[in-house]
């Protein structure tokens, strides 16, 4: 691994290690595996309505999504370009992945509920196009910001190189209700 990639990888680890953690209160700052699976289920039910194949929860996508949610929370910066101005492609490369396709949805202050997030994303044309995009893998991160008590969300969507060809969907009115 080159010195640059090693330095970036160490920085990536530092961001993950510096993120908020669950404390003794009732507030859950990080998304739980049950919530991640619930969001995946909502995505796949939606994709099924449009005759798209389901996605699977992917550990690498989840790691990249969590780290970006932590970065947005710590920096209070809502952006697809994260630390060192890295986008989702560069963040996936840090974990050793070079997906065929990649997409990212981010959000701020929607709240902790998965259904509220899905409703907000699906009513946005740009987010909906990602949810219904050519992806077969999915990962999500949610962090309660320690500075502002708002929720920072990030979802990473990808298709592995050489994976099956996922069809495009023609966008129209939303036919899904959450």
Model regions and ranges:
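Short, surface-exposed glycine/acidic/tryptophan-bearing loops
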Residues: 62-111
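Surface-exposed patches in mature extracellular/periplasmic domains of secreted proteins
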Residues: 27-28, 49-63, 76-86, 128-143
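Disulfide-stabilized extracellular recognition modules
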Residues: 107-178
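Short hydrophobic helices that act as membrane-entry/anchoring signals
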Residues: 2-17
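Extracytoplasmic
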Residues: 34, 52, 101, 133-137, ...
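Solvent-exposed, polar/charged alpha-helical surfaces in well-ordered, non-transmembrane soluble domains
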Residues: 37-45, 62-70, 90, 104, ...
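A short alpha-helix/helix-coil micro-patch that ends at or immediately precedes a cysteine
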Residues: 15-75
């Amino acid at each position: 691994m080159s010195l640059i990639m090693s330095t970036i990888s160490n920085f990536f680890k530092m961001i993950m290690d510096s993120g908020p953690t669950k404390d003794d209160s009732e507030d859950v700052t990080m998304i739980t595996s049950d919530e991640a699976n619930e969001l995946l289920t909502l995505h796949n039910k939606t994709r099924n309505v449009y005759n798209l194949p389901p996605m699977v929860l992917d550990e690498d996508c989840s790691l990249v999504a969590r780290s970006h949610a932590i970065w947005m929370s710590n920096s209070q910066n809502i952006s697809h370009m994260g630390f060192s101005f890295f986008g989702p492609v560069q963040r996936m490369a840090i974990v050793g992945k070079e997906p065929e396709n990649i997409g990212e949805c981010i959000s701020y202050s929607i709240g902790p509920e998965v259904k509220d997030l899905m409703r907000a994303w699906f009513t946005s044309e740009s987010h909906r196009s990602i949810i219904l995009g050519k992806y077969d893998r999915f990962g999500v991160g949610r962090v309660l910001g320690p500075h502002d008590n708002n929720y920072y969300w990030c979802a990473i969507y990808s298709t592995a190189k050489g994976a099956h060809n996922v069809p495009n969907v023609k966008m129209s009115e939303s036919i899904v209700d959450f």
